[in-house]
């Protein structure tokens, strides 16, 4: 399907620490209106990674030791091992805070994968994944995740009308009746509890419902590379396709 859920991976004290920390961030950091559909786009890095970047901190980019705590979390690493994910490594040494404010709009359908002109785009196994946690329980009412299973490997009609996910064009769309917000017949809701780990292939079409509550709904997302393309997973038994 292109995604999986591992319940209850993130627990206290780290879950409570992340909840308090992320709430504090949004109390002091202004959110760029360009990211109204995501809710925010705040990148936070490990201190070691930040030192290598040699840049000035801004509201959108800064470092915090809590990032390393999450990346090193033993239960998360074990979940990846149990799923057969090999050579999992942080893509950039950071995480992204995506927080839909009270009564925030929906997030459009999109794929986050960017290396479409490379053979890895056709690989039958993932090469880039996100590992994410919601800081509160999610439902359709407060903007839970939506996915279209199988679209990491299968083209559908929606692909023909989607602008590039990483350009101003899609951010500039104001019509909430546009197909990028549609309730696609193959889509499913993915409600989660706080602390549940959701892992998804970057090629998977996904979106989120609007937040119709008066409470913020925050997601902590960390991109990871997985497997070492072009080498297949060690457990791969089928013929390796010529991609």
At which residue positions do the language-model features occur?
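A short secondary-structure junction signal
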Residues: 105-111, 118-120, 141-147, 156-160, ...
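Non-heme Fe(II)-dependent double-stranded beta-helix
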Residues: 7-109, 113-117, 236-240
């Amino acid at each position: 399907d292109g995604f999986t859920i591992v319940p209850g991976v993130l627990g206290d004290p780290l879950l409570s620490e992340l909840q308090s920390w992320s709430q504090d961030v949004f109390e002091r950091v202004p959110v760029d209106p360009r990211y109204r559909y995501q809710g925010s786009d705040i990148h936070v890095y490990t201190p070691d990674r930040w030192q290598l970047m040699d840049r000035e901190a801004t509201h959108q980019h800064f470092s915090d030791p809590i990032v390393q705590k999450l990346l090193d979390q033993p239960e998360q690493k074990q979940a990846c091992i149990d799923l057969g994910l090999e050579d999992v490594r942080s893509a950039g040494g950071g995480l992204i805070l995506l927080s839909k404010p009270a009564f925030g709009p929906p997030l459009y359908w999109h794929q986050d994968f960017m290396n479409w002109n490379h053979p890895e785009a056709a690989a039958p196994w993932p090469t880039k994944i996100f590992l994410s946690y919601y800081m509160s329980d999610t439902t359709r009412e407060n903007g839970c995740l939506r996915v279209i299973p199988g679209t990491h490997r299968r083209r559908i009609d929606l692909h023909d009308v989607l602008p590039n996910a990483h350009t101003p064009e899609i951010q500039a769309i104001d019509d909430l009746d546009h197909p990028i917000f549609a309730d696609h017949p193959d889509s499913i809701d993915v409600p989660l509890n706080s602390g549940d780990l959701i892992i998804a292939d970057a090629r998977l079409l996904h979106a989120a419902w609007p937040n119709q509550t008066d409470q913020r709904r925050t997601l902590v997302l960390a991109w990871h590379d997985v497997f070492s393309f072009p080498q297949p997973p060690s457990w791969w038994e089928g013929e390796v396709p010529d991609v």
